[in-house]
Amino acid sequence: MNIGIVLIATKAYFVLGIRFIKRFMHFYKGTGDITFYFFSDTDPTDYLPEGINCKFTYVTNETWVDGTNLKFVSILSLNNCKSGYLFYFDADTNIIKDFTEKWFIGNMVGGQHYGDQDWMKKKKDYDRNPLSKAYIPFDTPLPQMYYYGAFFGGTKKNMIKFCELMRFNQLDDKKIPYEPVFNDESYINQYFHHHPPEVVPSKNFEFIISDKGRIGTTGFMNQNTDSLKNEIKNLKNNIFDVQYGKIVY
């Protein structure tokens, strides 16, 4: 089984993207052939040990919104890749225990947001602009669940088809012009609302979402992480985590 893992790790997210790859391979106990598709403004080659299959594509962005909106177009560039499955994870996702692909593999998969049964239990954070392609009305008759923008995936064929529509919707909204409050996540939720995926319930989600290791607080994306990059480059064979803004082994 050829599984492609897609990461977008520009600017300060680079360090976290390297963390994800190393910890993924360290804790992975499955049988799949794993390829990482690493979209970044920094080549990861000198930061990773030999034996990890990581394919680098240069991308850059000026704002966080531009960065998060790179997801669909980046995945579309993988149309001719050899991976039979493609799964996107946010670069600031962390892994702390052994796992296999069984918890996330599927034909088209979405993750139940951890807030779905918390602050969003009564009212989901859907986009409510009726002019937007991400629009879901308050009085929708369909069952409601709020999904992560930080994780989604499936077969390559399904992912390419999905991302083609998501990218079309993004570009169509730019003509208004309009940017949904939760960006790509709003489009993902609109699609899954009408086309329910195989769901990973939040209680079964085996990774930690949005763990930035306290690298800065505001304006995180543009934090200077040169010292962290130098440290992990010099110890590229070591598994590490980021805690309180520092590298820990």
Predicted regions and their residues:
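N-terminal anchoring/stem segment of glycosyltransferases
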Residues: 1-67, 79-83, 227-231, 235, ...
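Short, hydrophobic beta-strand segments that form beta-sheet elements in well-ordered domains
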Residues: 33-41, 86-87, 92, 109-111, ...
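Short, polar loop motifs at secondary-structure junctions
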Residues: 38-46, 91-98, 204-206
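Active-site regions of enzymes building and remodeling cell-envelope glycoconjugates
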Residues: 49-62, 103-111, 215-219
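A conserved donor-nucleotide-binding helix/loop in the catalytic core
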Residues: 59-89, 181-193
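GT-A fold catalytic core of metal-dependent nucleotide-sugar glycosyltransferases
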Residues: 72-120
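PAPS-dependent sulfotransferase catalytic domain
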Residues: 102-161, 165
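Catalytic core and acceptor-binding pocket of nucleotide-sugar-dependent glycosyltransferases
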Residues: 138-233, 242-243
